[in-house]
Amino acid sequence: MNLNDIATQLLFTTVPIRGNMPNGSVKTGTGFFFSVKDEGNPNQIIPLLITNYHVLENITSGFIEFNIQQNGEPVKDKSVKVSFDSNIIDNNKLGNLDLVAIPIAGVINDLLQKNIQVFYKSILPEYIPSAQEIENLSAIEDLTFIGYPNGLYDQTNHNPIVRKGITATPIWNNFKGKPDFLIDGGVYPGSSGSPVFIYNQGSYPTAEGISIGTRLHFVGVIYETSISTANNQTTFLNLGIAINSIVIYDELKLYVKKLLDN
């Protein structure tokens, strides 16, 4: 396993979430790691787990499954499940967005006390494209999104499912007046909370032509699957809706400030 490879690192930015509902049904979703710095103390890193609010809403209990590390590398056949209850979403909602941010430093430290080291890679603020970079994107961009569609993942190696798609609406437009964009790709229930990337290897289009090299942008988070219902039959349209990462980061900065003030 080449952990210096960007694509390999992206495999470890997500975790599966499984929750129990009061009626006995089960919800599945995707969470991802995002780390921010304390602006007052740049040496302090605040690791967060982010997912959709609706993934955790009304859940009575559940678990998040982390990869375990040994000698700085993930152990393929080992993981640890961390339980949670309905309090997990308390005071953690990101404004009016369908997102929650959960501080995980305490969880990681508790596991360390039990000699359990988890392995993960955080998405960083510098992966978010600037407003100018978004304006310079093509209307049709290749997208990569990572998660657990229908709760599916490689439970032996503890890896998520990586899927590809394209922008069905330009990222620089607000889809239906909201800070969203539409994805044409295999977006199914369980994909909620999946981070969406523009990840190009070798070359990619720019406003000036074709650039040589690698490009990585964290552009959004999936929160809805588009379906059509007719004659009591549900048809997935292979479309998903994602929240723009710039808006997410704006809310995250407010959330972290509130977190530190408390």
Question: Which residues does each predicted region cover?
Answer:
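Hydrophobic pocket-lining residues within nucleotide cofactor-binding pockets
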Residues: 55-56, 226
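Cytochrome P450 catalytic-core helices
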Residues: 51
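Short loop segments and helix-boundary regions at transmembrane helix junctions
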Residues: 40-42
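N-terminal targeting leaders that route proteins to membranes or the secretory/organellar pathways
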Residues: 1-4
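C-terminal subregion of chymotrypsin/trypsin-like serine protease catalytic domains
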Residues: 7-10, 198-262
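Serine endopeptidase catalytic core focused on the charge-relay Asp
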Residues: 11-15, 19, 27-28, 32, ...
